[in-house]
A protein has these predicted regions:
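Conserved helicase ATPase core of P-loop NTP-dependent helicases/translocases
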Residues: 83-87, 93-148
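Long, largely alpha-helical accessory region at the distal end of helicase-like NTP-driven motors
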Residues: 1, 221-234
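Conserved segment of the helicase C-terminal RecA-like domain
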Residues: 137, 176-213, 221
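Short beta-strand/turn micro-motifs composed of small residues
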Residues: 45, 88, 113, 191-193
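Alpha-helical elements of the RecA-like P-loop NTPase motor core of helicases
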Residues: 95, 99, 152, 172, ...
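Conserved RecA-like helicase motor core of SF1/SF2 enzymes
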Residues: 114-119, 141-142, 148-184, 194-196
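Helicase motor interdomain insertion/brace
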Residues: 1-103
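Conserved catalytic network of the ASCE P-loop NTPase/AAA+ motor domain
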Residues: 76-80, 103, 134-139, 155-156, ...
């Protein structure tokens, strides 16, 4: 519906930035070309139409983008052999970050996304994914910008710095992302949270779920120990 799409557009503007919002509208335009009249109606809404026109010549205004540029630049300058893994929920943001980070001296950045293709957003084949992971492992690529496909399944090499462009509501997914830091030495994990946006709610929800999960695991372990003690004393 128009309301749902407008909510998504505003959410992207607040948590991701102008470029991601434009990417969302470009995908909607592709859907409209395939005959989705509802999508065409949404794009024709005056405020949406005017935003697309005015935002095309605007640089990225969201502070997250500059924060990533600063952190990556500092990390690479301090240690050129470092590995950095950046997670984001959206392919629009993957493309935007690659474009921004490519201008930094010493940064060899590439993307790591899923295999599905949506509109102009083509996915990666499994062969391409495996080749990209090997490039990251060897150092040919030292900054990898990934969607959720980098969380599990494939053997993603460990990183010295993991940046989460936005928090994720799932405690398990958050733990999996943090688990991508280097195991043999200290790694750093940072999550970018835009104030007064959905980011803050998602971050709090994930923290509560994670605490609850660990509490449940502790209860289970305690019950197992009680049963073990009972059998031992019989």
């Amino acid at each position: 519906s128009d309301i749902r799409r407008m909510h998504m557009l505003l959410d992207l503007l607040k948590t991701q930035g102008v470029k991601a919002a434009l990417g969302f509208l470009e995908k909607a335009e592709d859907d409209g070309r395939s005959g989705e009249r509802v999508t065409n109606r949404f794009l024709a809404i005056p405020v949406v139409h005017n935003f697309r026109i005015s935002a095309r010549d605007v640089g990225e205004l969201h502070p997250k983008s500059q924060k990533v540029i600063d952190m990556v630049g500092e990390k690479i300058e301090d240690n050129p052999s470092t590995r950095i893994l950046i997670f984001t929920e959206y392919r629009y943001t993957v493309n935007n970050l690659i474009q921004s980070l490519s201008d930094i001296d010493g940064v060899r950045v590439s993307k790591f996304i899923g295999q599905s293709t949506s509109g102009k957003q083509k996915g990666m084949t499994q062969k391409q994914q495996l080749a990209r992971l090997e490039e990251f492992r060897s150092g040919e690529v030292n900054v990898l910008v990934a969607t959720s496909v980098g969380e599990e399944g494939l053997d993603v090499p460990a990183a010295d710095l993991v940046l989460m462009y936005e928090p994720v509501p799932s405690a398990i997914r958050s733990i999996q992302r943090r688990g991508r830091t280097a195991r043999q030495r200290s790694g750093t994990v940072k999550t970018l949270i835009a104030n007064d946006t959905r980011d803050q709610y998602v971050s709090r929800a994930a923290e509560i779920r994670e605490r609850k999960m660990y509490s449940n695991l502790a209860d289970i372990e305690q019950q197992k120990q009680k049963r073990l003690d009972f059998r031992t004393n019989m």
